[in-house]
Design a protein with these regions (language model features):
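Small-residue-biased structural context
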Residues: 1-218
């Protein structure tokens, strides 16, 4: 089975590090296979596949997508609370780096504001899922006779996912794709590594909802 890039990002920690190294935009390419993307870009698919195989960590264990309760619980536990916790810390780090290194030519000016804006949008988005969409999905699994209309709520969530993808591109642009200048401090290093992890998690989160969870109710 040919796996999509989004499947790889969702299943294997560290995949985005390899993709960034080869300048593969994993957010826009999530629905394409590695062969498709490398063919268009003229990259060596075999080399990239070997680098992916050499990643030190094994795959995450995803729950059975047919068990809606377990799948939703996984998303809540693995992503929703994690995003909230990490964004709060990253905003503080970004403010510190911008304040201390504002005169550096490669300082990520505007990153703290971009992270704060992402926090507000994600908080609103995840609250709608937690309070409205996910409970309705659980009810539909519990009661097969339920006729709760979910097409429009899911459509709205998909549109907001597109907005999150735009926010991810903004973070990548502000950080030069998370490329650290030489000799920067530990806070700057932690900021970029933490933001890169946030992006990796968010891409995987969106992929699991768009490609696995939502289609079961559309």
């Amino acid at each position: 089975m040919i796996r999509k890039i989004g499947d790889l990002v969702a299943s294997f920690p560290g995949v985005t590090l390899v993709l960034r190294r080869h300048k593969i935009g994993f957010c826009c390419s999530s629905n394409k296979s590695l062969d498709e993307v490398t063919s268009v870009k003229g990259l060596d698919a075999g080399l990239i596949a070997r680098e992916l195989c050499d990643l030190p960590k094994g795959p995450l264990t995803l729950p059975d997508p047919n068990d809606i309760n377990a799948f939703i619980d996984f998303i809540l536990d693995r992503y929703h609370q994690t995003h909230c916790d990490e964004l709060a810390e990253l905003i503080l780090l970004a403010r510190k780096v911008e304040a201390v290194h504002g005169d550096h030519p490669d300082a990520p000016a505007g990153l703290a504001d971009a992270l704060f804006e992402m926090t507000e949008k994600l908080d609103s988005h995840m609250a709608k899922e937690e309070m409205v969409l996910f409970p309705a999905m659980r009810e539909m699994q519990r009661n097969s006779a339920s006729t709760i209309p979910l097409i429009m709520p899911i459509h709205c969530m998909r549109e907001e996912h597109d907005e999150h993808a735009e926010a991810i591109h903004k973070l990548q642009k502000l950080t030069n794709n998370f490329t650290l200048p030489d000799g920067v401090c530990g806070s700057w290093q932690a900021l970029y590594s933490g933001t890169a992890k946030l992006v990796e998690d968010l891409v995987a989160h969106i992929h699991l909802e768009n490609e696995i969870l939502f289609p079961r109710f559309e």
